[in-house]
């Protein structure tokens, strides 16, 4: 999983932040409202009880479990969608990243393409891998 590091308020780049977390042996990548992202990650760390799903409207997330199964969360629903595609992307750079991966780029290069060709994706690009089972 790879991500850029931009955080915008409206059209203004206000800070650099991490967008991927390790939770329960898996990876969680998020895009959208910063407060909602932190609430979503906290919800996952606390056990992801569907009855306690935070009120959110402006968030996209990809959650990859320790076995490599990817699920997508979108806004108001606590029901994830299983991702069966070979690759996926979220956030402001999604269109460029998807095109780059279709053309053969790995996740790092896809995010680098988004940084180069979109206005709201910014470096540094960070790459995360699932930890090896021992």
Kindly give the residue locations of the regions a language model identified.
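N-terminal nucleophile
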Residues: 1-134
């Amino acid at each position: 999983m790879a991500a850029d590091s931009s955080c915008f308020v409206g059209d203004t780049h206000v800070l650099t932040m991490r967008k991927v977390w390790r939770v329960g042996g898996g990876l969680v990548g998020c895009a959208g409202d910063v407060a909602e992202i932190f609430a979503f990650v906290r919800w996952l760390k606390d056990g992801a009880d569907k009855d306690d799903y935070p009120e959110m409207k402006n968030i996209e997330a990809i959650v990859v479990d320790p076995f490599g199964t990817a699920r997508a969360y979108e806004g108001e629903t606590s029901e994830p969608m299983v991702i069966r595609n070979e690759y996926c992307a979220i956030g402001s750079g999604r269109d460029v990243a998807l095109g780059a991966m279709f053309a053969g780029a790995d996740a790092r290069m896809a995010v680098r393409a988004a940084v180069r060709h979109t206005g709201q994706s910014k470096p540094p690009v960070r790459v995360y891998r699932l930890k090896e089972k021992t």
